[in-house]
Design a protein with these regions (language model features):
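Acidic, His- and aromatic-enriched active-site or binding-groove loops in soluble protein domains
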Residues: 66-78, 183-214
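Positively charged, Gly/Ser-enriched RNA/tRNA-binding surfaces
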Residues: 2-3, 25-41, 51-52, 78, ...
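Short, well-structured alpha-helical patches and their helix-loop capping segments
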Residues: 83, 103, 107, 125-127, ...
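Short, glycine/charge-rich beta-strand/loop segments that flank catalytic centers
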Residues: 47-56, 106-117, 166-176, 196
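Short acidic, glycine/serine/threonine-rich loops at helix termini
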Residues: 56-59, 120-123, 178-183
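Hydrophobic mid-domain F-helix/FG-region of cytochrome P450s
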Residues: 153-157, 174-182
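TRNA-binding/sensing appendages of the translation machinery
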Residues: 1-85, 89, 146-149, 167-170
Length: 284
């Protein structure tokens, strides 16, 4: 007689059950978040859990040998489909599909789970919820960004934080791209450089972690190695010096290339607009 198999009551690595008080609190916070999204004029959007893999894009992964390694993908006939990695890729696909039916300025919010095939860690899960608010279309960038900062401020206050408990850091990608162009960093290395800079404020990184990723490689506490951009010493120094600058006037003097200056001007316009909103004391 075949032995009866016993059920192993466990979860896959990187996933968790959410229940009781923790789930009740989550639902309360989501209600505040959604109410603010609606107050700021956004319409809800739900997209399927799966997208066609080629629409997700190989830019998501850092491993050139296996560019889709950070996502969960499956074969569906002659196509590959991927579990939703974020809420931005589905939005881009939706707008491209429905562009003719959308208003010239389209505000949408989405609150859905996303899935990452990444190494789990403390507080780092393979399935988690994102809440996105986006403004798409013909609008003034400074006003749109100020509106988003006011939305963030109002939402966090309604969720129970006070103004002393959070700040909103802003930047402009044109400033970074201008520096990258100025340093003659090759195109195949640029994405790694941008990803390294984006990790500056991430716990456990700081300037030391960014420096390692700008060089040959970074080894984390577990011993896992991430391949770096392999820049030369002067390029690394210039980027680290740039990251230490906190004053917009100093930045304007240091980066004289046209693209960076354009990004700095957009930031200046933003700070003029934000002075009239609820977020003026929260933004830096």
């Amino acid at each position: 007689m075949e032995k009866e198999k016993k059920l192993n009551p466990s979860l896959p690595s990187g996933f968790e059950d959410r229940w009781d008080k923790k789930l009740v609190l989550k639902k309360q916070l989501l209600k505040e978040i959604e109410n603010n999204f609606i107050k700021f004029g956004a319409e809800p959007l739900e997209t399927p859990s799966f997208e066609i893999s080629e629409n997700i894009g190989s830019f998501l992964a850092e491993d050139e040998a296996n560019p889709m390694s950070d996502v969960f993908s499956f074969k569906d006939g002659d196509k590959s489909i991927t579990l939703r990695y974020d809420l931005s890729s589905p939005l881009a696909r939706f707008v491209a599909q429905n562009n003719q039916e959308l208003p010239s300025v389209y505000k949408r919010y989405a609150i859905q789970n996303v899935f990452r095939n990444e190494k789990p860690g403390n507080g780092r899960y393979r399935e988690f919820m994102q809440a996105d608010f986006d403004i798409i279309g013909n609008t003034n960038p400074a006003q749109a960004n100020a509106e988003l900062c006011n939305l963030i401020t109002n939402t966090l206050l309604d969720c129970g934080l006070n103004k002393e408990q959070f700040t909103i850091n802003v930047s402009n990608r044109k400033i970074v791209q201008g520096l990258i162009n100025e340093l003659n960093i090759s195109e195949e290395k640029q994405l790694k450089v941008i990803r390294a800079i984006d990790k500056l404020d991430k716990p456990g990184f700081g300037l030391t972690g960014v420096e390692a990723l700008l060089k040959k490689e970074r080894k984390d506490a577990s011993g896992a190695v991430t391949k770096g951009a392999d820049l030369n010493d002067d390029q690394v120094k210039q980027i680290l010096d740039f990251l230490k600058i906190k004053d917009l006037k100093e930045l304007k003097q240091k980066l004289t290339n046209e693209l960076s200056q354009e990004g700095i001007k957009e930031l200046e316009d933003f700070f003029e607009v934000i002075n009239f909103g609820n977020a003026k004391d929260q933004v830096q």
